[in-house]
Every structure is written in structure tokens, then in C-alpha cells.
Design a protein with these regions (language model features):
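Accessory beta-strand-rich segments of carbohydrate-active enzymes
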Residues: 25-28, 33-35, 76-205, 231-232, ...
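Intrinsically disordered, low-complexity Pro/Gly/Ser/Thr-rich segments with frequent PxxP/GP/PP motifs
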Residues: 248-267, 688-722, 786-809
């Protein structure tokens, strides 16, 4: 028995020794040092210089107080990280050992046992180096030197005969938002922000495994699995998956081959709100002699098309998913932290779940951030969130020297190969707002460029976004997956064509100071950016302070956590138009959130009513990098602002919406479901005491995937009713499902609200019933560290609602708009 056990253990060990193995070096004891300093300090990998300086109490938390200004010196320094590691017996016996650097930020020299093995210059590239010849069995010293990205960028800028806008950031392939944006601080960091892996193998290595859907119908799917294997010799390898075995001859070097798989009665993958997100999970075993590599591939079966078809006003811009024209509902996503290594799996889950709960089906990954972590895309695959993937270029012009272009090409290859298997990828987009910047932002005059300068800069733009990136996509992706859009938007918001073709970033509201109602007149074919600022939740505001302080709009900390130069001025101007501006800070915070939600609601509903002319609405922005007053609907702590609750309502598959045009109220039902809806619509004009002043009803049929005007209500009907004291209630019931909408005839500041008596009846530890005697407008439920299934809602008399919190309700406070409209309450 002992002899048998010894044989089994020995045989198992032999198999393991011969396999391709990967070891993460994160857990090694890392230290770091500022150039010119003799001290070595403890470091966390993955991480960044800033997080490590905080770890060692060298700098304060830049998210607190006005500390971001106090840590600007960090970006001008050079830094070195080091660790040592031993080889395992298995690694020592392997014929090949490779170091893989998944994320180095940014200008880096890597030394292994004193030998320079890598000179890196791109945060977004994946660097692989064969290191077998440089390794020892024990005490291998890995040292990584980081140069100041700011200083390096400035030196590169000086090599050009002309200046490019945005200074040094455009010369460095790193996250552009680190240099500061109008929603985030300037924190130009450095460090090992993704894992370093030690990969060992002997006779073969699996370099890549991907798939292509060759055929897909209701009866059968044909999928091609594509392998790239690196072999040290001529040999035969066996591939096993789905209880099938295949044999493949390999030659010495790089081998490309494929295997077709038939899937009977395929289950389709659908975006959120359209059906199931079914994912096939294939486990592959690749064997050669005693060596084996395992790899799993998870994918959904679906088709995606981007259609741009000429019509009488311009050209459409819409996505077809599995042959169905799909209305896109979602938001623009920025990195979740200035120091991205701090973003946890829980953070990703919380954000993606909040997006799904808000009825979104797409996220646009904005081009000034990062190509995000694999886990982000995995969650999008699982939850049905389509991804509009920008390449990482934003709001500036980039150089076109050969070194830079080679860097761009390899970055594109690395990231497309990394992300290509994700079912959720719907579109690859070259950049954010650079085409618009060229044509509309007046840089040619501002920067004093000559005709030759301008020609050179435009040619560089064309080379990157109309040649290099699309050619890389062509070389890697099958035609069915190669959907490329060179720049978003295609036409600037000041041009009339921006409303008749392509995608649009409409900033007449906010930047142009146009009223919210302009959203109803300026409806594009696909709205890929628009938005308005609002303050974060009170919990997040308090997190800005290192010590408890009086909350005030004039606080240095509050002012420092608003990065738009005219942010407060703009918010105040719009607030005066629509609300009574509170003097109390808590109430101002509340109303700023209502204002943001109101403006965005007007935009979303105008877009959706215009279906199929408009087929997409992506607001700016989903989330924040730090605690800040911004366009986000989710603040830095992941709390839902009023906007996110409103988005959830405005993105429901069935939406009742009202548009006022002169003296007529046009009532629509938008149906994104893939089935017709039949039922009765009830219309009521109700005063704020709950009395019905006018009623009507109508039987309707709302066809699937349409926007339908069901009624026009003339001002004549409303004669004798004070519109400052009444609202229109619309209720629709179909197949047991109920939908409703309250529409107010006047702006919030003009409503003649009376003080509501709001009653709470506890049901259990996190659930209660809420009711009121008169209209309670925009009811705000505030409980520390809690989120409710609905908030910032209208509570009407003679009705009650059941509200559920995610956590135990501890100290519930309730506000309504009435509290902000009376001097004694402020």
C-alpha cells in the first residue's frame, strides 16, 4: 500500500512538473524607494506610488480635505521597486521561463539579477520576456525603475516643432485622466498596477485560444475554436473538450489551427431586459506527452450588427442584436479610482449590479481612462451589459512619430487580443471627441499652427485612427465581430448634422447653458454623451473630510471637490430656473440631486419617445473616481444619487412619457419589450389633496419595440384647474402588469405644495409602509449606510408604498420638496 501511494504521488508530481505553470509574484515581499533616498519602504503589488506612500504615512489621503494639492510633488520624482524570489523545483526543471508584466505604469526599466531585461513605455501593453538564462535557483532580484511620466512627457513634447494641446499627457501612453479632468484630481502616479507572472513550460505553450461563430440559427450553431500554440519541436498534440478528442500535428515554432464545433438547438445570449444571458463554458485540455495545459472559454451565442442606413433626413445609427433592432440604454463609464489597483471585485460587482438594476443594457468605456480589468468584462458578459469600448485616447491630438505609432499598434494588438472573446463587446471606438476637437474647438488658431503643422497633425490623426487601429482589428477579429467607429461623436453638437446621422455628444445643456427643455428639440440618432452635474450623497460628502466639520458650500474642501471651473456657477444658474435655491447645505445637496435627475429625465424621455429615429441614450456619467460633485449617478462610495433612481424609472422597458408642445400634452407609451401590449390606460388630473378633477380612459395596443403616441390632451380640458396644484396621473395595465406616471404641469419652484404628514408603518427590520395626507413631492429617504429599492419619488395621497432597504434601518430621516420651499424649514 505504501509503495502504491508513493507511485501515485510521484506520478502526479511528474505530470505537474511537466505542465505549463503560472505563478503570481504579487505575494513576494516588495519594497520601494524614492530616487535619491536611502530608505526602502514596504510596498503593495499591485499598487501605485501614491498608495504605497499612503501606506507608509508619507503623504495624506489625497481624497480628503484639500490634500490632492499637497501631493503634486509625487509625479515629478523617480521611484524603484524591488523584490526577490526563489524558483520552485518545477520551475527550475522547465526548459522555458517567462516573466509577464500585465501592467507597468509607465516609463520603466526592469532588471533581473542586475541584467536589463525590459525597457517599457506603455501602461496599456502586456510585456513578456524570456528569462531562463538570467535566473538562479535562489534569491533572484527583480528591480523595476519608474521614471516620472510628467518629466518624460515634457521632454518628448520639446522634440516637436509645434505645441499640442493638453501638454505632456498626449506623449505618454498611460491613463489620461490621471492628469486631471473636470470631474477628477490630477494624480499622475506610477507603479506595478497589475500582476507580474512567472510562466514556465518545456515543450509547448498555449499562446491563444479564441472562437468565431460561423453560423447561428434556431436549430444549430457552428463555432470555430482557434488555437495558437508555440512548440519547441515537431510533435503531435491532443486537444480534448466536450467529451471529444482531436489530434493535431505541430511543427517547431508558432502553430495556428482550428477545430469546428456544432451546437444543436443553441441558446442565445441577450442583453439585459431582452432575455437570458446564456453562456457556454468549454473546458479544453491540451496534451503533449506528459505535459498538459487546461483552459476554459466562456462565451455567448449572439449576433451584433451596427446599422447606418440612409433615410430622408440623414442616416440611422442603431444596433441589431440577434436580428432585433435594440434600443440602447446606458451610461458612460470612467475608472472607479485614481489608483485602479484598489478597485476590488466587490466594487465591480456593486457597479455592474447597480447598472443592471437601473435597466441598462450598455456601458460605454470612455477613452480617457483604462482598458478595464478582465473581471469587469466577465461581469458584463454574465449580466447582459453590452460594451462600447473606446481605445484610450481623449480630447487631444497625439504625436505621429514612428516610435509612438509602433507603441500604438502593439497596445492595440495586446488589448484586442485580451478582450476579443468577451460576448459583451459591441463596438470598438477609436477615440473620444478628437475628430470633434479638430473641427470645432478652434485649436488651429489657439495654438498658432501653420498650414504645414495642421497638415502634419491631421495626418497623424488619420494614421492612428483610420489606419493603424482598424488594420489591427481587421487582422485579429472575424468580420462578424469587427465593428469599428473611428471617433465619438462623429459630428460636434453645434452642427445640425449631429442630429441627423452618427452618434452625438450634446452639450448645449450644461456647456451651452441652454434650458433642459432644449433636449426635446435636439434629439440625435444616437446620444452617446449628455448630462448634468449634481452633488454626491451626504455620506460621500462627509467622506471628503478627515475630521468632522461644518458642511458648507463655501468650505475649502467642498470647493476642492468640484473640478469644473464653472461647476457651481452652472448648477446655481439652472437651479434658480427650476427650483427655489435652499440656503441649508443638506437641502441644497438634496435639490442639486433633484436638479440633475430632472434634466437627465427630460433628455432620456425625449430620446426614447423619438424611437426609432433615436435608438440609443448613454448619459454622462455612470460613476466617479473620487468623492466629487460631478455628472455621475453613482457616487464614489457606490451610493445611488437621485439621478440613478430616476434612470431606473426612465430606462424601464415600458415607459409612459409626456411631451408638452404649445398648448397640447402628447402622451406616449414606449414599449421595448419583444411582445405587443394590450390594455386600458386611465388618465386622471389629481389635485395635491388627492381629489380627481378629470378622468378618462382608453383601450390601447402598443406594438412591440415601438414608441406610440396614445393621446393628446388639450389645455381646454384643464380649464378651471390650477395647474400649480395638480398633476396628470397616467396608469396602464396589460396582462397583469401595471405601469404608471405622474406628470407635473409646472416647474418644481412654481408648485403650490403644502406640508405633508408622512406616516411610516414598520413591517420588519428593513422594510416599511409609507403614506401621506397630501402630495409629498420627491420624497428623500436618508438612512446611514443604507440604500432603498426606491427613493426621490412622488408620494400621492390615498396611496401607500412598501419600501425595502438593503440593510437594517437605523435612523431614518425623511425629506420632501416642501421642506426646501419654505424659509422656516431652511
Amino acid at each position: 500500500m505504501r509503495i502504491l501511494l508513493f507511485f501515485v504521488i510521484t506520478f502526479f508530481t511528474f505530470i505537474q512538473l511537466s505542465a505549463q505553470t503560472t505563478r503570481n509574484l504579487n505575494s513576494e515581499n516588495w519594497t520601494f524607494q524614492q530616487k535619491g533616498d536611502s530608505k526602502w519602504l514596504k510596498a503593495g503589488v499591485p499598487g501605485s506610488v501614491h498608495t504605497d506612500l499612503m501606506l507608509n504615512n508619507i503623504i495624506p489621503n489625497p481624497y480628503k480635505d484639500v490634500n490632492d494639492a499637497k501631493v503634486q510633488w509625487v509625479e515629478n520624482e523617480d521611484w524603484t521597486y524591488k523584490t526577490s524570489f526563489d524558483l520552485t523545483d518545477a520551475e527550475r526543471k522547465a526548459q522555458n521561463i517567462q516573466l509577464k508584466f500585465n501592467g507597468l505604469d509607465t516609463y520603466t526599466k526592469v532588471f533581473l539579477n542586475g541584467k536589463l531585461i525590459l525597457d517599457a513605455n506603455n501602461m496599456f501593453r502586456i510585456w513578456e520576456v524570456l528569462v531562463k538564462d538570467f535566473l538562479k535557483y535562489k534569491n533572484n532580484l527583480l528591480e523595476i525603475q519608474f521614471k516620472s511620466s510628467s518629466n518624460e512627457g515634457k521632454q518628448l513634447a520639446n522634440l516637436l516643432p509645434y505645441k499640442l494641446p493638453e501638454g505632456e499627457r498626449v506623449f505618454t501612453r498611460k491613463a489620461q485622466y490621471q492628469y486631471g479632468w473636470d470631474w477628477g484630481p490630477r494624480l499622475v502616479t506610477a507603479g506595478i498596477y497589475k500582476p507580474i507572472e512567472l510562466i514556465s513550460w518545456s515543450n509547448f505553450k498555449l499562446n491563444d485560444l479564441s472562437y468565431e461563430i460561423l453560423k447561428l440559427d434556431k436549430n444549430k450553431a457552428k463555432v470555430k475554436f482557434k488555437f495558437i500554440i508555440q512548440s519547441k519541436r515537431n510533435s503531435t498534440t491532443e486537444i480534448e473538450f466536450n467529451q471529444k478528442k482531436y489530434s493535431q500535428k505541430l511543427t517547431k515554432g508558432i502553430n495556428h489551427f482550428s477545430i469546428d464545433e456544432i451546437i444543436q438547438n443553441p441558446k442565445l445570449w441577450w442583453p439585459n431586459g431582452m432575455g437570458e444571458q446564456y453562456l457556454y463554458d468549454y473546458q479544453f485540455k491540451i496534451k503533449q506527452g506528459n505535459e498538459q495545459v487546461s483552459k476554459h472559454l466562456k462565451f455567448g451565442l449572439r449576433t451584433i450588427e451596427l446599422l447606418q442606413e440612409k433615410d430622408k433626413v440623414g442616416s440611422s445609427f442603431y444596433f441589431k442584436i440577434n436580428g432585433i433592432p435594440t434600443y440602447i440604454k446606458g451610461a458612460n463609464y470612467i475608472p472607479q479610482d485614481n489608483f485602479v489597483s484598489r478597485v476590488s471585485k466587490n466594487d465591480y460587482e456593486k457597479l455592474i449590479n447597480s447598472s443592471v438594476e437601473a435597466n441598462m443594457n450598455m456601458i460605454r468605456i470612455w477613452g480617457g481612462g483604462i482598458y478595464d480589468d478582465d473581471y469587469f468584462y466577465e461581469l458584463c458578459d454574465e449580466k447582459g451589459l453590452l460594451v462600447w469600448q473606446d481605445f484610450m485616447y481623449a480630447c487631444a491630438f497625439y504625436p505621429g512619430d514612428q516610435d509612438f505609432l509602433n507603441n500604438v499598434k502593439q497596445e492595440t494588438i495586446d488589448q484586442v487580443n485580451r478582450l476579443k472573446n468577451h460576448t459583451s463587446i459591441a463596438l470598438w471606438c477609436g477615440n473620444n471627441e478628437i475628430d470633434e476637437a479638430w473641427h470645432n474647438w478652434g485649436y488651429q488658431k489657439q495654438m498658432g499652427w501653420s498650414k504645414q503643422d495642421s497638415l502634419s497633425i491631421w495626418n497623424d490623426y488619420q494614421t492612428t485612427f483610420h489606419y493603424i487601429i482598424p488594420n489591427v482589428l481587421d487582422s485579429i477579429l472575424p468580420k462578424s465581430e469587427n465593428r469599428y467607429w473611428p471617433s465619438s461623436p462623429s459630428i460636434g453638437w453645434g452642427k445640425k448634422e449631429s442630429l441627423t446621422q452618427g452618434d452625438s455628444h450634446y452639450w448645449g445643456v450644461w456647456w451651452g447653458m441652454e434650458p433642459f427643455e432644449m433636449y426635446e428639440k435636439k434629439v440625435p440618432r444616437f446620444a452617446s454623451e449628455y448630462g448634468f452635474q449634481g452633488m454626491p450623497t451626504l455620506e460621500t460628502v462627509i467622506s471628503m473630510f478627515s475630521v468632522k466639520d461644518t458642511l458648507s458650500k463655501n468650505s475649502a474642501t467642498i470647493l476642492a471637490h468640484q473640478k469644473h471651473p464653472k461647476g457651481w456657477e452652472t448648477i446655481n444658474e439652472y437651479m434658480q430656473r427650476d427650483y427655489i435655491v435652499p440656503t441649508d447645505f443638506v437641502q441644497y445637496n438634496y435639490v442639486s440631486q433633484l436638479l440633475q435627475a430632472r434634466g437627465t429625465q427630460i433628455a432620456i424621455e425625449a430620446h426614447r419617445r423619438a424611437k426609432p429615429y433615436n435608438m440609443g441614450s448613454l448619459y454622462w456619467q455612470l460613476n466617479d473616481v473620487w468623492p466629487v460633485t460631478s455628472w455621475a449617478s453613482l457616487d464614489k462610495l457606490g451610493n445611488w444619487k437621485a439621478l440613478h433612481y430616476q434612470v431606473k424609472r426612465s430606462f424601464e422597458n415600458v415607459l409612459i412619457s409626456v411631451e408638452k408642445e404649445e398648448n397640447v400634452y402628447k402622451i406616449y407609451i414606449v414599449n421595448d419589450l419583444l411582445k405587443d401590449l394590450k390594455g386600458k390606460v386611465k388618465f386622471s388630473v389629481i389635485d395635491f389633496n388627492g381629489n380627481k378633477r378629470w378622468i378618462n380612459d382608453k383601450d390601447v395596443t402598443i406594438l412591440s419595440n415601438t414608441s406610440t403616441k396614445i393621446m393628446e390632451l388639450n389645455d381646454e380640458v384643464l380649464k378651471g384647474i390650477s395647474l400649480t396644484k395638480a398633476f396628470l396621473r397616467i396608469e396602464f395595465e396589460s396582462n397583469g402588469e401595471k405601469y404608471s406616471r405622474n406628470y407635473f404641469f409646472e416647474k418644481p419652484k412654481d408648485l403650490a405644495l403644502t406640508k405633508p404628514t408622512i406616516k411610516i408603518k414598520k413591517i420588519n427590520h428593513n422594510q416599511f409602509e409609507i403614506s401621506t395626507n397630501v402630495l409629498a413631492k420627491d420624497v428623500y429617504l436618508l438612512d446611514e449606510n443604507n440604500q432603498f429599492d426606491d427613493n426621490f419619488f412622488d408620494l400621492i395621497p390615498n396611496e401607500s408604498r412598501i419600501i425595502t432597504g438593503k440593510n437594517i434601518i437605523k435612523n431614518l430621516k425623511i425629506y420632501s420638496l416642501y421642506d426646501t420651499m419654505n424659509a422656516e424649514n431652511q
